[in-house]
Amino acid sequence: MAPFLKKPKVIISTDLNSESFYPGEPVNTRIFISSQDKTKVRAGTVNLICTEVYWKLVSDGKHTRNQKTKGDLYRIEEEFLTPTELFPGTEISVQKSIILPADSPPTISGRVVNLSWQLDVKLDIPKTRDIHEKRAIIVRPITMATPVMDDGEFARSNRITKSNDEGDLALILDSDHGIAGKTLSGRFEVMAKQDTSVDSVRVELEMNESAGTKSSKTVVDMVQLENEITFFPGAQRQWLFSLNIPDSAPPSFFMGNSSVEWRVKGILDKRRWKDFSVEYPIRL
């Protein structure tokens, strides 16, 4: 049996230029190594790792259940130290830069979807456990500018309709892209084809998350437009509205086992009967 080799007394510390980054930006770090032992190092590497937490169905032959698991969506590794030998009192300082890929997924901490990034500095030590220094970082989403319409008009291309025997519904938005911390404005239109009584007319901002076999639906904001109204054949009504997008709203996302989807819904709530609604998918 091979003798037990104790972990060498080597300390790693890092100094990051920032704790949050955008895709395509460099992650610059100063790496400090201090040794109190004589130690051989096979290699020193810097890793940028994006970890996804999701659920999957597992079965023991009798029962099936959801099991939480995790996996790497991204792992970028670069070497900063070639094979070397450390001695007591050895101190090393290395500046290293790694570029985040342009398509890097953002950090997301939702009800279901969870994506996290970390910087992992590793020393590969023969015949014993590697030495790590890990730092959490935040990768921010790249937001898209919201087009501004002249004279308060809504773009015709940002219109979606739905029809049935009762009537026609239409949602018109000022943009199909939302920005966290801002409002999304639009107009909800109803044209009735027959007598229709509803308990309420409202619009909702809805977020749908999915991580493997687990999902969540959240109404993030809601505006009540009308209560207890009856539409007669040929009647037309329209309402302006604004929905608030929270500062902490996660961006639209689809990669690996995870997704975040956003939509605006215009709803005729008929309570005892199936609601009549129209949905407009948006990107955040």
Segments and roles (model prediction):
Residues 1-284:
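C-terminal beta-sandwich interaction modules and adjacent acidic
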